[in-house]
Structure formats: structure tokens, C-alpha cells
């Protein structure tokens, strides 16, 4: 039997993305139960990844069950990511990708469970939107689209788009279109691009999705 999958997310945008893009793709691979879980930061249940302990609590709550018929993963941004354990290990890495990979390892070591797969998006959700100009075409005017195309042309892999605060993917979109609405437009843009194009361009993201499929299929 196929395993269930829970993905801990930091916000509504990621929650929608799991529902509207990741889940339908996984259904093609016969993984039918895919549930995004918003990080609980307070009594109100609002999302946001501001404290590692909140994420850990949510993961451990899901993993408390002894059952082996599910996998728990996470989908959070590297940009503005709060400190995760073992800073001495990940902070010394010189590249962002090195830091992210080490941070994922440190989280894995901290939440010791074979059913748990950490994933941190380099550099943030919006990077995925730069996989193609297709998505922006519907929502941006000609001048805005041209600016987006220049950014797309500068990076083979959108996951490399820089994380200096003003260079972060979301900041770049806001600089082009001031009223960009992350939750609504972000996912509509992603839907326009299509999941296969995002997978093709964003190699770390693709590796994560492929790993989830493999683990959900393992007996």
C-alpha cells in the first residue's frame, strides 16, 4: 500500500502550492493522501517559520504514531530561515547550497526518525516561479515581463537567485510589480508554468519530490 504524506509548510502560499501543484502530481504516482500542515506558531494557529522549535513540535506530533504507513516532510524557505540546531556545522559552509544541505542534515539528526525528510527551499518559494516566463505572462504588463525575462536569462537554475535581502526572488518580483500578492498570484503563476517545467528547472526541488515518491512507494 502507498504511504500517506504530510508536508509541514510555513505559510498559506506553500499550503496552496502543496494542494494545487504537488498533490496532483503525486496522485499521478498513486500517492493519493498528501496533506499540508501549517506550522503552528501560536494559539491562533497562524503559520510562519519563526522558531525552529515550532517546526520540531509539529513534526514530533505527527511522528508520535507508531505506524509506518506515512512520511512527514517539510517545505520552508532558506531566506529568513530561523536558526536550526548545530549552527557550528552549517554556518561555516561558504555557499548557500552547502548551508542548506548541512541544515537539512542537522534537522534530520535532531528529529531522529526514518519517516522524516527535511527540505529547505533555496532561496524561497518564489524561486520556483522563475522557472519560466509563462506564468508571469498572464499577470504582468509588457515592461514587467521584460524585467522578469532578464532575471530568468541570468540564471540556469532559478534556485540560484540570490538571497541578499533585496535580491531574494520575492523582493525582485515586488520590485517589478508592487502589488504582487504572494498567496493568490504566486500559485496562479505556478499553475501557468506547470509542475513539469518547475521540476525541469529546479533541480533540488525535483530531487526532493522524487525522493518523496520513492519513500512513499517503499513497503
Q: Whereabouts are the PLM-identified features?
A:
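C-terminal accessory helical subdomains adjacent to catalytic cores in phosphodiester-
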Residues: 1-2, 15-41, 56-219
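N-terminal beta-loop-helix "entrance" segment that forms/cooperates
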Residues: 41-54
Amino acid at each position: 500500500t502507498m504511504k500517506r504524506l504530510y508536508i509541514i509548510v510555513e505559510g498559506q502560499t506553500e499550503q496552496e502550492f502543496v494542494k494545487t501543484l504537488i498533490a496532483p502530481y503525486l496522485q499521478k504516482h498513486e500517492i493519493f493522501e498528501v496533506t499540508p500542515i501549517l506550522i503552528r506558531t501560536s494559539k491562533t494557529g497562524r503559520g510562519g517559520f519563526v522558531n525552529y522549535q515550532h517546526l520540531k513540535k509539529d513534526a514530533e506530533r505527527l511522528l508520535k504514531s507508531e505506524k509506518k504507513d506515512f512520511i512527514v516532510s517539510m517545505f520552508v524557505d532558506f531566506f529568513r530561515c530561523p536558526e536550526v540546531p548545530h549552527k557550528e556545522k552549517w554556518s561555516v559552509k561558504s555557499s548557500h547550497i552547502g548551508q542548506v544541505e548541512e541544515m537539512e542534515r542537522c534537522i534530520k539528526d535532531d528529529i531522529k526518525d526514518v519517516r522524516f525528510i527535511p527540505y529547505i527551499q533555496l532561496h524561497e518559494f518564489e524561486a520556483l516561479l522563475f522557472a519560466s516566463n509563462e506564468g508571469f505572462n498572464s499577470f504582468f504588463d509588457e515592461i514587467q515581463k521584460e524585467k522578469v525575462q532578464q532575471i530568468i536569462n541570468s540564471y540556469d537554475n532559478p534556485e540560484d537567485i540570490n538571497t541578499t535581502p533585496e535580491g531574494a526572488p520575492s523582493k525582485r518580483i515586488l520590485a517589478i510589480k508592487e502589488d504582487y500578492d504572494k498567496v493568490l498570484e504566486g500559485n496562479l503563476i505556478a499553475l501557468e508554468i506547470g509542475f513539469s517545467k518547475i521540476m525541469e528547472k529546479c533541480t533540488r526541488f525535483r530531487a526532493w519530490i522524487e525522493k518523496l515518491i520513492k519513500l512513499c512507494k517503499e513497503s
